[in-house]
């Protein structure tokens, strides 16, 4: 059942998962929000109970946001940074915090609120939880990435992560620096009780995600090595998944529901 209004009955006995979508680009507004099949796996948890608390799912659309420097078209080789103002990612963090406050004001205990996101939404989840984990129960970052298909474009499987980042910094020095700044800020967290799902064949940050393991509290899970999970072929709808970046939206990913519920 879909409730388009922000209504939570018996809020003290609810667990709220806030679902954040990916982005078509890093900093500009977009016409799209959630794609087909995006909800299926998290929606499969709705109405299940954990310690007599019922799970609900809230889909937060922030696709219309744009960063303060978006008009400057800063994704270019001669942009040196630093970024002036708030990025779209920062504004998405703020939107989540506003929603969290509304839910808490309605009576939902803060530790029963969880933030999750895919791709740029997963990157944003890391940004939010690293600074505001006191306001929620935890987070789930799914194939987190927001700076392009770095792993594929720069052939990470052949040259290694360090060489990929060197080439990226040479081509887009300011952009690469902005990514590094965000990673450094996320790594400042002293305890980050979140799940971080990655896949080695993800064309975005598939082989560039080891840094997240340095953060205390993070449980990194490598989804699979291929396009099966526990012997089950991964599909989105009726189509086989061929892009590992989308494997967290495939039916096979529900294998991890018990892990998520923990």
Place the predicted regions along the sequence by residue.
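C-terminal catalytic histidine-bearing segment of alpha/beta-hydrolase fold enzymes
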Residues: 216-262
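Short, surface-exposed "cap/lid" segments of acyl-processing enzymes
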Residues: 6-49
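A domain-start/cap signature at the N-terminus of enzymes
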Residues: 1-14, 55, 157-160
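Primarily recognizes the serine-hydrolase "nucleophile elbow" in alpha/beta-hydrolase
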Residues: 102-105, 111-159
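Alpha/beta-hydrolase active-site loop
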Residues: 74-106
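Active-site-adjacent alpha-helix of alpha/beta-hydrolase-fold enzymes
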Residues: 34-49, 198-236
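Conserved alpha/beta-hydrolase
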Residues: 47-74
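The feature captures the conserved acid-bearing segment of alpha/beta-hydrolase catalytic domains
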Residues: 146-224
